């Protein structure tokens, strides 16, 4: 049984978000001993308990106050929200922040030889999906009537099996659609992972831990999006070089021993550095250019 004095976090046991959710918590300094068959795990260095469950159970666990936090895909969260509202409930929770993984899209897909000129082609058609409420919300806005075929897995086989005229399913790379002779026709919802919290006041100790966790998550995400850059640069081209790079702060400029015309420049850049950027730096006279990953970052 979970100790209610400890912060309770629900995450996906296996699947699309499981590995990256675990990595995020570990990069935030939470030491967790996860065992494959165990649904509960306990942090060794913080008062945090982890509940590992199916992804579509996570929103309900948060909304029903079983856990304090949940890491969940926005698509699953929105579907649960719409489901509960359709049942006359008033689901309560709030989103702490979007995360930088789990990107996908919910799309309409058709057999390769099915004509498509727009969503109007779906009028009166039978559509197989695991997300009936998101699909209905999208087509209701367009005033398009359709028939829904609810499937909780293997949605891609529905058109060839004669179960549906089209599908509405998650797409990441499109490889699964291609393997089943389908093509993506229309994106109806874009999703990433997010961190949600139950409604209601937390204890002072729990809230303090949540605040600390949010700062660490921000540091992890910012570090992923940033690079540490070192180079030797001619003093007369410093302004031009700095203008090429978006930095978290002004660069550090250090003198080079025995060279009055060049300096060492260190900076954190919040932009992805492509080869073209490095070639432009070299064209401005920079040399010994190093681009390094950042593990952790706090401003």
Curated annotation (Swiss-Prot):
Protein name as it appears in the record: ATP phosphoribosyltransferase
Cofactor(s), names only, from the UniProt record: Mg(2+)
Family: Belongs to the ATP phosphoribosyltransferase family. Long subfamily.
Pathway entry: Amino-acid biosynthesis; L-histidine biosynthesis; L-histidine from 5-phospho-alpha-D-ribose 1-diphosphate: step 1/9
GO molecular function terms attached to this record: ATP binding; ATP phosphoribosyltransferase activity; magnesium ion binding
Natural source organism: Sodalis glossinidius (strain morsitans)
Domain of life of the source: Bacteria
Subunit composition and interactions: Equilibrium between an active dimeric form, an inactive hexameric form and higher aggregates. Interconversion between the various forms is largely reversible and is influenced by the natural substrates and inhibitors of the enzyme.
Entry keyword set: Amino-acid biosynthesis, ATP-binding, Cytoplasm, Glycosyltransferase, Histidine biosynthesis, Magnesium, Metal-binding, Nucleotide-binding, Transferase
Gene: hisG
Catalytic activity: 1-(5-phospho-beta-D-ribosyl)-ATP + diphosphate = 5-phospho-alpha-D-ribose 1-diphosphate + ATP
EC number annotated for this UniProt entry: 2.4.2.17
Disulphide linkage map: none
């Amino acid at each position: 049984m979970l100790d209610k004095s400890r912060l309770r976090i629900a995450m996906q046991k296996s699947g699309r978000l499981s590995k990256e959710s675990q990595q995020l918590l570990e990069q935030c300094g939470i030491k967790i001993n996860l065992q494959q068959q165990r649904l509960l795990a306990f942090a060794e260095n913080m008062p945090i308990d982890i509940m590992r469950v199916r992804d579509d159970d996570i929103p309900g666990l948060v909304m029903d106050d079983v856990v304090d936090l949940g890491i969940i895909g926005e698509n699953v969260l929105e579907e649960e929200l719409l489901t509960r509202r359709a049942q006359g409930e008033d689901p309560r929770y709030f989103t702490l922040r979007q995360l930088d993984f789990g990107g996908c899209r919910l799309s309409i897909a058709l057999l390769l030889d099915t004509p498509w000129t727009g969503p109007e082609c779906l009028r009166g058609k039978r559509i197989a999906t695991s997300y009936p409420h998101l699909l209905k919300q999208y087509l209701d806005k367009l005033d398009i009537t359709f028939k829904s075929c609810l499937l909780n897995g293997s949605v891609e086989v529905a058109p060839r099996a004669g179960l549906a005229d089209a599908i509405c399913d998650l797409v990441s790379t499109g490889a699964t659609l291609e393997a089943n002779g389908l093509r993506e026709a229309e994106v109806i919802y874009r999703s990433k992972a997010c961190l949600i919290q139950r409604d209601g006041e937390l204890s002072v100790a729990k809230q303090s831990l949540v605040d600390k966790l949010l700062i660490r998550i921000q540091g992890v995400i910012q570090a992923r999006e940033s690079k540490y850059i070192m180079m030797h640069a001619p003093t007369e081209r410093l302004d031009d070089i700095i203008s090429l790079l978006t930095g978290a702060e002004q660069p550090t400029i250090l003198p080079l021993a025995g060279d009055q015309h060049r300096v060492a420049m260190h900076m954190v850049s919040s932009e992805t550095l492509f080869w073209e950027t490095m070639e432009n730096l070299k064209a401005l006279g920079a040399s010994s250019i190093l681009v390094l990953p950042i593990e952790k970052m706090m401003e």
